[in-house]
Amino acid sequence: MPQDAVTSPSRLSENQISEFQDLGVTVIRQCVDTHGLAELSRAIEEDIRSPGPFYHGYKSEEGSGRFHGNLRLWEHDSTFRKFCFSSPLPQIAAGFLESQKVNLLYDQLFVKEPGTLNRTRWHNDQPYWPIRGWQVLSFWIALDPVSRDSGALEFIAGSHRWDRWFQPKAFGDTAGQDEYTANPDYEPMPDIQNHRGDYEIVSWSLEPGDAYVFHGLTVHGSGGNQHQSRRRRGYAIRYTGDDAVYDTRVGTNTGLCSETHHDGMILDSDRYPVVWPAS
């Protein structure tokens, strides 16, 4: 994959970095070019045809549409691996996180086929993950035009600074992990959807190649894909910085855990590799 398939770190502005720090989310336009999108699209179709071991999916509650998701794709597909390791994304992550190094936590695929009306419930990501630390973010790259009626992500501005961890729940009747053990240190997610006016909700429409960048504690969710002919494909990469360490709290996603780490260990390993600076 050519380096210029992903935007250069030099294109990042101080406004984007401050927006990420203040709101917990920002957008990079034209983050991935048409060549990179074509490579990702081919890899996504291959995963749909022959899913990896961490596939999770469901049919729409209304009987039409389908959701396809997967985790840790980089471990068995060279295209995803190149995006995670060899693109400028790790260096861009270092800029947002103000970190001297960047580890790859994992990558993830989200495909809402046309007519998949299920909402993605409001949540923040880090309670699902076996890590602790402040320097944690995700890139969510759009492969299709994304609008409110096709499932654009919505974010609660500033929620990454609430210092609140919400109880993980499964996202529909999936083929993946279907329940999470209750953690007494977590709290239930407020009923944001029925009290939207009480929150500052921010969202952006995306074109193919645009990307959301958001903190691991930013509360977010999305609507269903109401289009009958347009898919909503998103590819996410999760990176961590200097202060992230392994932490298996009650209620984390077992598919993201490591057999060789114990709580408090730094992540650096084949399982959570250092991807910047490149070795």
Give each language-model segment a name:
Residues 130-148, 205-208, 213, 238-241:
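Short, conserved beta-strand element in jelly-roll/cupin
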Residues 89, 99, 114-116, 146-148, ...:
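Short, charged/polar surface micro-motifs in flexible loops or helix N-caps
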Residues 33-34, 110-112, 127, 146, ...:
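Short, solvent-exposed loop/turn segments at secondary-structure junctions
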Residues 1-23, 28-122, 127-130, 257, ...:
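Non-heme Fe(II)-dependent double-stranded beta-helix
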Residues 108, 124, 141-145, 157:
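Short, structured patches in soluble enzyme cores that scaffold and shape functional sites
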Residues 148-219:
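Double-stranded beta-helix
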Residues 97, 124-136, 199, 206, ...:
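A short beta-loop-beta micro-motif enriched in histidine and acidic residues
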Residues 2-5, 50, 54, 58-59, ...:
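Non-heme Fe(II)/2-oxoglutarate
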